[in-house]
């Protein structure tokens, strides 16, 4: 039996479960900060993780134009090479003058910064916001709400279900 390389989740080590209520509160807190920095012409969600926070932020800021940039970097819980599956539409890019000025990029998490760098290169003047930030990715975002350590794995509510959790004393992480 060959030993496989540990996944990002296993290497991260520190679980950080986030409930729907907590995520919604954090997205509203992000919206409060962003409201002072606008106005913005459109929201661009980095999919898939940025879809839910983008919807909440767009509602809170009264933005009707919502676009996506689709970049794949994780396959389940293992990070791989980045792939642009869909870029920002020409219509949205035009709203930002081609450089992103007045556009708001939203993601759930900035981790290593690889995805952020790629999107930043597409729209260098856009405002980049994330709900959560890790130290390696933090310099790439303009606004975030909560910083977690680099060795933390965030369990987002759309990736989890209700189940029994053993007590910490029994070896639960």
UniProtKB/Swiss-Prot annotation:
Xanthine binds at residues 111, 154. Its EC number is 2.4.2.-, 2.4.2.22. It is an enzyme of class 2 (transferase). Signal peptide: none annotated. 5-phospho-alpha-D-ribose 1-diphosphate binds at residues 48-49, 107-115. It comes from Rhodopseudomonas palustris (strain ATCC BAA-98 / CGA009). One of its GO terms (molecular function) is xanthine phosphoribosyltransferase activity. This is Xanthine-guanine phosphoribosyltransferase. It comes from the Bacteria. Its cofactor is Mg(2+).
């Amino acid at each position: 039996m060959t030993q496989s390389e540990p996944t990002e989740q296993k290497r991260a080590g520190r679980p950080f479960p986030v409930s729907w209520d907590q995520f919604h509160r954090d997205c509203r807190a992000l919206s409060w900060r962003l409201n002072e920095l606008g106005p913005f012409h459109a929201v661009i969600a980095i999919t898939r993780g940025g879809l839910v926070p983008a919807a909440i932020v767009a509602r809170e800021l009264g933005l009707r134009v919502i676009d996506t940039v689709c970049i794949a970097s994780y396959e389940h819980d293992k990070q791989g090479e980045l792939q642009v599956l869909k870029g920002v539409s020409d219509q949205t890019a035009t709203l930002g003058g081609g450089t992103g000025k007045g556009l708001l990029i939203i993601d759930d998490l900035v981790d290593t910064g690889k995805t952020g760098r790629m999107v930043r290169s597409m729209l260098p003047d856009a405002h980049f916001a994330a709900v959560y930030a890790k130290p390696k990715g933090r310099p790439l975002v303009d606004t975030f709400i909560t910083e977690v350590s680099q060795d933390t794995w965030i369990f987002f509510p759309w990736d989890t279900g209700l189940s029994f959790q053993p007590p910490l004393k029994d070896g639960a992480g």
